[in-house]
Amino acid sequence: MKDYKNYIFDLYGTLVEIHTEEGEDELWKKLSFFYGFYGAVYEPEELQESYLALVASEKNSYAHEAYPEIELEYVFQKLFEKKGVQADMELAVHAGQFFRILSMEYVKLYDGVKEMLELLHKKGKKVYLLSNAQEIFTTYELRYLGLIPYFDDIFISSSCQCKKPDIKFYKMLLEKHQLKIEDCVMIGNDNTTDIAGAKELGMDSLYIHSNLSPELTGEPDSTYYMEEMDMKKLMEML
């Protein structure tokens, strides 16, 4: 593998293993309690249907974007407003985080992640995160996992209102830090987002087929390819 100056990582399925279940009846029952505590009384099924409808509406408002990304905190705020409750953004964020915690079975680092990131820093490399994710979830999960200090900068799609494979998302990082494409490599577990965007931009990439990767038909469109998650092997490549 070529020696790069800048290493750009995806998060979920690449550095972090996570499992969430958003369709469980118990989740919506408990979330309806949360909203009811603040005067926004929902039946669980009504709350779920309202949430899904608002998510669809928010996505439609960004229909001019090729790969739009919404900010979910506004959905959780509108769920209060729909019941006549004026909720500030702090309460909306807390509602969203409660939803996330209820949905989460686990979130953890793949073995060896911190050692791998430390190795890159010891070699004088820059390390960036480029994640299709929600700010109100991911920033706190990064803090919980102790990952924030390992990145030179973090880009989360909901804050940028676009997501991979949109090359605009990659360019935000490149332009902010004045990086040359040839000095960068994108590392991710999704051929249709992480790798596709890098390829369109002309950036080298490493595809890792992890347990969270979407089904892959044929060979990935990446410069390099790992058939399974193996942080020790990755460290040897770097």
Predicted regions, residues:
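Short glycine-rich His-centered loop
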Residues: 8, 16-17, 53-58
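Asp-based, Mg2+/Mn2+-dependent phosphohydrolase catalytic module
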Residues: 1-7, 17-21, 38-45, 90, ...
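Short, acidic loop-to-helix structural element flanking the phosphoryl-transfer center
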Residues: 66-74, 82, 88-89, 98-128, ...
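A generic alpha-helix surface/boundary motif
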Residues: 29, 70-74, 136, 168
